[in-house]
Amino acid sequence: MAKIRVYELAKELNISSKELITLLEEEFSVEVKNHMSAIEDEDANLIKELLSGKEKSEKTKEEDDEIETTAKNPIKESTNNKKPNKRDDKNEKVNTENAEDMAIITITSETITVKEISDKLEKSYAEVIKELMLMGVMASVNQEINFEMAEKLAAKFDTEILREDEDEEDDLEDILRDNEEEEYLQKRSPIITVMGHVDHGKTSLLDAIRKSKVTSTEAGGITQHIGAYTVELNGEAITFLDTPGHAAFTAMRARGAQVTDIVILVVAADDGIMPQTQEAISHCKAANVPLIVAINKIDRPGANIDKVKQELTEYGLVAEDWGGDTICVPVSAHTKEGIDDLLEMILLSSEILELKANPNRKAKGTVVEAKLDKGRGPVATLLIQNGTLRVGDSIVVGSTYGRIRAMFNDKGRNIKSAGPSTPVEILGLSEVPEAGDKFYQVKEEKTARSIADKRKEKIRDEYLQSTHKVSLEDLYNQIQEGTVKELGLIVKADVQGSVEALKQSLEKLSTGEVKVRVIHGGVGAINETDVTLATASNGIILGFNVRPDNNAIIASEKDGVDIKTYRVIYDAIEDIKSAMLGMLEPEFKEVVIGTAEVRQVYKISSVGTIAGAYIQTGKLARNAGARVIRDGIVIFESELASLKRFKDDAKEVAQGYECGLSIEKFNDIKEGDIIECFIMEEIKKKTL
């Protein structure tokens, strides 16, 4: 059934949008959010009939009153034979026409540039600037004016300007509204989230279930990014989400709880309830998600299952064998004891929940992870929560969109379609989406682009300009002097999940004296654009597992922008916290002494991998620190194990020369890798 916007109907009826909204709510009990909301044609026709009926009755009454007045006061012949004023008639006619034919334009933000409003009004920049000057506003083409000023300006050109603040989610829900009656629903697999404290064995437990070694691929044995995996048990599929356990990734855990059906809370039998365990319990309760407690490491000396159950009661979780309704399963990821019992409990709980979805509708779900791949472009891991997603479908994801070019399952196999509760990796998006964004399948790419563009315009950042640069070393002094009221940070990381976690952790550091604000977060190497943004917004750049490119380094030195890079997320948080408290006392400074590009790779059985490299900048020195950078992301960090010039050992090799080198404990060197050589210089401590 066709629909009509409130403001369009108001224009037809020649009344204000506000009057129409009131009429809809009082006379028809139709609730609408604002002038941009859509109503059914049937309701619109009823309103037209009602108003036309009122107009007729009012008109009849007016005529009766006029006749009565005429009878009481007969018209006297005018002694003044003055002709009617044609100018007045003309003006009255023009005003009436303008009221009826006034053009309407919409904007989606609080501000708009002079250029944008000129284009919308279809007037030259000179005309618009002239009108602004007459209104006492001096503005150039690229300067912004607020909504109130834009409204007054539009009125000068017989145009009404409206603020479009509708939620696109409503539009999408309208687009996606399919039949969800019982006959269309089918049983779907449960989505399981594994939560718990650091090192309590979450990933090891998943390894035991999947019979694979994920932990060995993660730096330091700690899961850094969310992964989604599907396992088969007795012919039934179970989807697992592995959320990192350490405190800085609270946001990731919260995101996992929003899409999950059942949470497995892993608690070490020898450790008991820890801070992150408490947070996980809170997330589950807030999301109203069923909980199964896996008491892990029961093979360890000092394991005490009863102690864990006792601690759980303090948080309202009473084990079934203690008379409660919380399922507790003792397991050992190491010996695989209790794994089968745990899986049986998952399937039993999912049967009770009666999980269903409609595979024959348009797909929708959530982004689990997203990153930028040099060869494949934006790559996103999606969890389909309803409907079926196919290769070739158009989707809108947050403020980005795309048409699916390829789709892979959790095992890396190319697939053509995927149904509810299935995690997939897709290619074809225009940009890297935010982890946790909702995705929706739409009819065509044009619709997806339109919705994404609206969202981009809506969330466009307005950056504050400042002249004084901030660095971590002098941040405390500037806070004390009152120079800094807001600390702007640009966060770059290797994957979107890390960006999100860093943003949330850093913004929590805000105090009464200074507010910490992440003005931008993105995936990939630190580039010149990031430095430009930091310059304009008086910010500091933080990199997690990424490095600045050459242009960024040159620009940062020129503009005095502070760039800090980290491999451990807590170091970044502690540095900002210490700087704000005036406790930042740097003892060593990393100095990059040179970079080299790997041109050829040789594998020698007795030695390992030798790289033939060309020195691009500075020099390489033996025994100096070295990191391998691939596509702007730090792959490995160690030191140079050997450095040769031809067949001779060399202490150092200068810029413009070629050399052979090997990296300590690292053999996965590839052509095109950048070897960054650095030393740690001791510097004087600063008193802040």
From Swiss-Prot:
Ranges for region G1: 196-203
Keywords of this entry: Cytoplasm, GTP-binding, Initiation factor, Nucleotide-binding, Protein biosynthesis
PROSITE patterns cross-referenced by the UniProt entry: G_TR_2, IF2
Gene Ontology terms: cellular component: cytosol
Domain of life the protein comes from: Bacteria
SUPFAM superfamilies with a match to the protein in the record: Initiation factor IF2/eIF5b, domain 3, P-loop containing nucleoside triphosphate hydrolases, Translation proteins
Annotated GO MF terms: GTP binding; GTPase activity; translation initiation factor activity
Record-listed GTP binding positions: 196-203, 242-246, 296-299
Composition bias, Basic and acidic residues: 86-95
Keyword Protein transport: no
NCBIfam families reported in the protein's UniProt record: IF-2, small_GTP
Purpose of the protein: One of the essential components for the initiation of protein synthesis. Protects formylmethionyl-tRNA from spontaneous hydrolysis and promotes its binding to the 30S ribosomal subunits. Also involved in the hydrolysis of GTP during the formation of the 70S ribosomal complex.
Protein's recorded name: Translation initiation factor IF-2
Gene encoding the protein: infB
